[in-house]
Amino acid sequence: MRECISVHVGQAGVQIGNACWELFCLEHGIQADGTFGAQASKIHDDDSFTTFFSETGNGKHVPRAVMVDLEPTVVDEVRAGTYRHLFHPEQLITGKEDAANNYARGHYTVGKESIDLVLDRIRKLTDACSGLQGFLIFHSFGGGTGSGFTSLLMERLSLDYGKKSKLEFAIYPAPQVSTAVVEPYNSILTTHTTLEHSDCAFMVDNEAIYDICRRNLDIERPTYTNLNRLISQIVSSITASLRFDGALNVDLTEFQTNLVPYPRIHFPLVTYAPIISAEKAYHEQLSVAEITSSCFEPNSQMVKCDPRHGKYMACCMLYRGDVVPKDVNVAIAAIKTKRTIQFVDWCPTGFKVGINYQPPTVVPGGDLAKVQRAVCMLSNTTAIAEAWARLDHKFDLMYAKRAFVHWYVGEGMEEGEFSEAREDLAALEKDYEEVGTDSFEEENEGEEF
């Protein structure tokens, strides 16, 4: 089997984990205690779901997941929540003191005490796998645990499991909805440290999700539960091909092969459609062409940036539900003719398609309408560099005055690490810029000298 192990780090990671596993259980007909429900026999013609769940001797299904936080409160909610019997108690790991929004605490002082225990639990999970495919790591950029501990964990996973893929689902700090003043510091430090260890990172910008909840789902004041349920739909779409049989299936390494042209340029933009409330869905025909087209609208994106200003390097369309290849080909052809999508000139074709016949499931009492088909688009576009530019600018404003730096240095970090990380991100922005310049322009430049 091709197993995937999910690691949920810090408050954001764990809470998104809750939403994701709730949805996965619904999709696979697994009840809150890990046993199969009445409908399950219908669903289980295929056993692809064992990529995410392991089965115990007495027929219970346990997620292949670890939840880690350096302070106990968030994981305690899991321990006392609806799904408390789903997880093995050893899969829920907590420390005693939190990282206090401080990357240095998560990476050096406090994180160091928990890392071996976490790796030991991950080792137990990997030992139970026959063909481990890789790791999915859920975390935020802004928190201390999410940034610091994740980067420490990624370094150690690279050591222990060198060739296995590591995909991140990272919560990008939202410009409007900030939870900590030092988010830009943490984000840039963690990006710098994990850049060489991560194979592919799907960024989700809280503000973009807020806007989608307000605009498409008519939720005036979205809560984290609303956001996380939406994020879990996206994670579900990206991982559906790993958990169900389909016509055109995509596995973890295939994502990388098709989306990452250069090792550092591994931040695809995620777009999902249709995001629609039950009242509206009742009156709309959401055809393949329509949902495909809405993927190219900036307001279905998970990160605020404008792809019309950038160029596409690769594009991966993951359909699920009632979709046939012919419709997809027609829809994509229409987009190529109608839309002004600019691909970089060294990558002319650029569309990869996956189709999965399992229609999207929704959480009962949730915000999303039950629809027959959905699509998740992963595109590698140079426009996402806008997101880095925003963060870098905020970092510069604070770092020019060396604001808050003493908290990091006090935890054993060197000040030089800040400037090193900032230089690395400047290089990343430059990389994106260079990838977007046309190859024939460069050739002409060379002749002038």
Swiss-Prot record:
Processing after translation: Some glutamate residues at the C-terminus are polyglycylated, resulting in polyglycine chains on the gamma-carboxyl group. Glycylation is mainly limited to tubulin incorporated into axonemes (cilia and flagella) whereas glutamylation is prevalent in neuronal cells, centrioles, axonemes, and the mitotic spindle. Both modifications can coexist on the same protein on adjacent residues, and lowering polyglycylation levels increases polyglutamylation, and reciprocally. Cilia and flagella glycylation is required for their stability and maintenance. Flagella glycylation controls sperm motility.
Short sequence motif MREC motif: positions: 1-4
Reaction it catalyzes: GTP + H2O = GDP + phosphate + H(+)
Major localisation: cytoplasm
This protein's record includes keyword GTP-binding: yes
Biological process annotations from GO: microtubule cytoskeleton organization; mitotic cell cycle
PANTHER family linked: TUBULIN
Protein name: Tubulin alpha-8 chain
Species in which this protein is naturally found: Bos taurus (Bovine)
